[in-house]
Amino acid sequence: MQLRDSLRRTKIVATIGPATSSPEMLKAIIEAGATTLRLNFSHGTHADHQRSIRLIRQTAFELNQPVAILQDLQGPKIRLGRFENGSIVLAKGDRFILTNRQVVGTQDISCITYEYLAEEVPTGAKILLDDGRVEMVVEEINREKGDLCCCVTVGGKLSNNKGVNFPGVYLSIKAMTDKDREDLMFGLDQGVDWVALSFVRNPQDLIEIKELISSTGKQVPVIAKIEKHEAIEQMEAVLALCDGVMVARGDLGVELPAEDVPILQKRLISTANRLGIPIITATQMLDSMVSNPRPTRAEVSDVANAILDGTDAVMLSNETAVGNFPVEAVATMARIAERIEQEERNSATRQLRDSRRSIPNAISQAVGQIAENLGAAAIMTLTQTGATARNVSKFRPHTPILAVTPHVNVARQLQLVWGVKPLLVLGLPSTGQTFQAAINVAQEHKLLFEGDLVVMTAGTLQGVSGSTDLIKVEVVTAILGQGIGLGQGSVSGRARVAHTGLDVSNFNPGDILVAPRTSADFVEAIRKASGIITEEESLTCHAAVIGLRLGVPVIVGVKKATQVIRDGAILTLDVQRGLVYSGAVGTP
């Protein structure tokens, strides 16, 4: 039962930056627990990001582990212009003008990167600058000049390009800028796995980006970053359209009272869980680790509470992008997650009940309950798009989920989904064959062992998304050997280990012949056999030639077969893959 105890359910998103741009650091943070790597398109050039993408893909290949790449678009962040001396200091009571005119900033005025400033911001509106460090109120508006004449209510320092927020004011600004469109096309061309849209306000913003992605022929899922009050007011409609959510607590805490953010975080997580879409909790989770090797106790509690709330993933920003301890930050987050999850399993915490009636929902919920009742080592899902795995995940089963898919992009995307370990397995003609191949891969990766119980779920209509309607329980059997298969399909039977023709004098019809090599003395036994296993490797050996002539499946080149396989044991031969299993394994 090693898998159930060791697999961390909560995923970790790490932001790539100067501190983690080398191959050695990328490898280290992935090995420490990062499952998705975020590229922040507010910084860096396309050449920088292209280099990062290539390094991530190469490192993931070397580690034999799917790693998702999340492209985070900058969005229409409203900012100040540049000051003639780089910065100014404002005091409470100072008068200050914000204008849409292109002027160089002084002690009295600064331009702002929004054209319709004077038309849409009313008198009396509160304006927050530099994440709320400076605050002012609009006293007068000059629409002809495009000026907002303000009074400073909270003083402080302002410098070039600092952000500006208008809490409670409805602006007609679009969620995607021209830069975002260029960045999106670049990201799609580079094969990113997720795209995060910043400053989402309404469902139309999501429709726009999805239509853009669709027009390129791609199917990249979109994450809605919730950081505007308008998005909160239309939460259900926004979340129903996106493929994932990010609780962007930085700007959200400026747009809304800071004390509201924890409540909104819980609401967003609960809604995303119910809808079965992954949710990331982000911003300042381990912020002190930018410069310190250990987090504060409050930060540990913040990460822990997000996990207890039900977040799929927790995110590191500056901690891994520019921090002094990026690997330690990832490892710390992984340790917190493992400890909290251990406590959750021990205390049998609540599991989601989805009131929407559907066959996939009922199957997905039942799979978790069956796995827990039977003490299964894993739940195994066959999925073409990731939908089956996500559906099982939303019910938060205590048993780990192995998501079997033939598509590498789906495997990467599932690295953002709670409790899911993706396995890349080539699609085979039948569901049973694909499950058996997946069990083999899981055994090779030490995720499953002989005797483990696995609860399987899939759709009987292979390749059709959303058709989950099958539950199957199976015991993992050992792979006794591997060689080269000659023939078709799979056969099961009782092993008859023979070193000479005399050893098969009482050979029964349907038995499987196991021998170092065969000769003319074995022909009568071969006529009765359902299969042949030999240690001899040649494809033109006696067993291979006679087996093909008589239509008997053969696996040649199975090393030490006569030593490993016990006489009288039940075996299954998977001829297509050249595998010999212990026990009768169904591969319909």
Q: What is the role of each PLM region?
A:
Residues M1-P18, S22-P23, I30, T45-Q50, ...:
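Expand to "…catalyze enediolate/carbanion chemistry for C-C bond making/breaking, isomerization
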Residues S6, A14-P18, V169-T283, M289-V300, ...:
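Conserved alpha/beta-domain cores
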Residues A47-Q50, L55-L63, V67, Q107-E135, ...:
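Phosphate-interacting basic helix/loop segments used at nucleotide- and nucleic-acid interfaces
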